[in-house]
Amino acid sequence: MGWQNVSFLTDVSHAEPMCDALLEAGALSASIEDADAGTPDEQPQFGEPGSVNTPGWMHSRVVVLLEPDADIEALLAEAGAAIGLSEIPAYSVENVAEQNWVQLTQSQFDPIRVSERLWIVPSWHETPDPAAVNLILDPGMAFGTGSHPTTRLCLEWLERNVSEACTVLDYGCGSGILAIAAARLGAGHVAGVDIDPQAVEAARANAERNGVTALFADSATPVAGEYDVVVANILSNPLRVLAPAICAHVRPGGKLALSGILREQIDEIIAIYAQWIPLQVADVREDWVCLAGIKP
């Protein structure tokens, strides 16, 4: 027997309170979607750090998962009354078949071939090429599973630029994928830093899973020193703000690679970094670019 997936429309002021009330009334899960998604009225909620985002969608859709035998109208009435609604909203119901959700989720993530010798492999998969450099990485809380163009741009750049025993810093490490790749490609000392403590914990766990030694730290315990190679795959606003700090970690003659940059942002980022490191376009994938340069 499956579950009942119930959805209804509401406004931004009632969406979150209704979700809370539904969960309190016994719903298994409750989420909010943009009812205008895929139309010209779609409202983006997440942008660059520092940008002003709206607190919710003006036209919201609440989606609730209920037990198979749940009384939908009674539950909606109870939740609505709890937040002061006098009427039950019009709703639709979709039956959701019972499935092995872990197996279903895992089936959506296949090994990713980055290059001739570099693969990203979820832990539940067999490695397609045991002789390759296989990065064992599961989708999780931290950004960086290898599927995004910027991650692949940085991995390809590292493969071309990491030399035996060089030192590497992954600035904004997320899952730690770039630092782990550098270590597996032959780097000596490898470090990573991220503002998010959860990302640091994920990076440490991923490094252990891959059998590599890397120092990961959050912003409370910043990484010190200069490195032969520094790579930063973060958004363009942090790249602007953190330019002096990032460049300070590159030793004279060392290499820097930046990604998380769109085509239209190339000139601005190059201009900002020019006083420390001359950058040029190293590679492009879709609308994303990787900029790289050598510190004088």
From Swiss-Prot:
EC primary class: transferase
Q: Which residues bind S-adenosyl-L-methionine?
A: 151, 172, 194, 233
* Top-rank taxon: Bacteria
A GO CC annotation given for this chain: cytosol
Q: Can you name one GO molecular function term for this protein?
A: protein-lysine N-methyltransferase activity
HAMAP family assigned to the protein according to its UniProt record, in alphabetical order: Methyltr_PrmA
Protein name (database record) = Ribosomal protein L11 methyltransferase
